[in-house]
């Protein structure tokens, strides 16, 4: 397994070009199954999960090519089952189910690896499709959906806010007979992006970005060209990198209006921030950040995917800061690893109390999930000495060439090939 070796401390400064958003690219790739004509999707990040999704679409009979953009022609799709060997590495494959049953009247997706119904919100995808008239069976580890004729529009009130299930219901409803209303819908920018992609293909959707989305079903979707929005979490991660190293950065190909809550907290921490239409700059003027209090919640509140990075910011900031996680359980696995580097923190139920220290020391640490691992790499950039970050396959799932981008900002980081 590959590792990162990071030598610190360094002040990170310079420019970085932000990649397309993984969390919009994946649902958009699967939504392309609804189109009867070719689509071109631009600004798709080069990531493991994207490659897996493209493989899966090919196995279903779509023609998939990548040359800068991703080109998908789903006119010849003739296989309606997403097999376990591809699904096991990636939960996003559940997004194949809605488009398959909506367009072809049938679809099967292997249950995502080690996923028990109820514990993870696959059940919300299922109840949503059932409300649109699909019959769902769970057999031999597969979710099997079918419908006689077309799906039927419905008024769906979601039990809890779920990005994944909002995508599934919205995609399926585009080809349903009649009107579908989704109440308590997720409001994330990636939902808006997926809806806008569907509209480009001829779908009739209104209210995306609010908690009430209305979809008027159409008979077919055509082709089109669409550009995926910039990755707000990658943008936030690089802004934090500059803030904790007392540096300055310019993020290009960014979308500032998707990051209001994060930018507000960075300003509270003492960062000087400017924004343009497609760029964000941050300058610490050589100062140490101040501790901030953060509470995660669904969009437009502070994103859970920026929690680990802000935990790190607080651990090297002036003062004491509180970070409360309300979205996911067990999302503080980076804290004990950062403690190995000299960070001072206590976890009390779903809150981390961070006592800022002046410096961290390099250590051997282990990545546990995507965002936690990014925070460990950033910690290595500012720690005294050498940090080895193990299990970095987590990072490769969500950050495109993070080491190259950090190196361009002055980080001393290398990928070490594992046994």
Swiss-Prot record:
Signal peptide: none annotated. Coiled coil: none annotated. It is an enzyme of class 2 (transferase). Its EC number is 2.5.1.7. The active site is at residue 115. One of its GO terms (cellular component) is cytoplasm. GO terms for molecular function: UDP-N-acetylglucosamine 1-carboxyvinyltransferase activity. Belongs to the EPSP synthase family. MurA subfamily. This is UDP-N-acetylglucosamine 1-carboxyvinyltransferase. The gene is murA.
